Amino acid sequence: MLIKQLADIRSGVRYNPTMYPFARKLPDAQALADVAGYIGTLCFPLDSGKYEGADAAGHIAGGKLLYENNCARCHQPNGAGKKEALYPVLAGQHFRYLLRQMTEIRDGKRVDVPAEMFEALSMFSNADLVLVSTYMASLNTPESLLCRTPVTKTKKQE
């Protein structure tokens, strides 16, 4: 899945102005595979990037209903995804990342996804995207993806 994402960024199919300059420097398929292999060894910091607003509990409850009705069939009820079908892990992803990706898919800036994603997200309002992103970020990250050492925030991240 990471190889496809990097290839899509490099070709301009996937909108990511931050990564594009780096991805386009990868000279061939082996370089893409090498970088994807390395990225695949990285882990998710525990409890990193959760929605922290005072209304988080309400957002999680509302987002859970949206997730169960629109996302769980492909991404699994626990958000673990289906690697063999190229459905990514959503559980424990960073709230802002999830919100940005779903907004870009809904708004047509990201076109490297199955038609079902466009259909599912086309009916989501901005508020719905905040709710479902809050819920997905609150899910437990699969154990195999967690960092075992604490990650400290930089001043920019705080």
Protein language model annotation of sequence segments:
Residues 24-48, 101, 120-157:
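C-terminal capping alpha-helices of c-type cytochrome domains
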Residues 1-26, 60-64, 76, 80-107, ...:
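Gly/Gly-Pro-rich "capping" loops immediately C-terminal to redox-active cysteine motifs
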Residues 35, 39, 63, 68-77, ...:
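The canonical Cys-X-X-Cys-His
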Residues 40-66, 82-86, 152-158:
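Electrostatic cytochrome c docking/interface patches
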Residues 1, 7-19, 26-34, 42-49, ...:
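Short sequence/structural segments immediately N-terminal
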Residues 46, 77-89, 112-116, 141-154:
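Short flexible/disordered coil segments
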Residues 11, 40-44, 68, 76, ...:
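Residues at helix-coil transition
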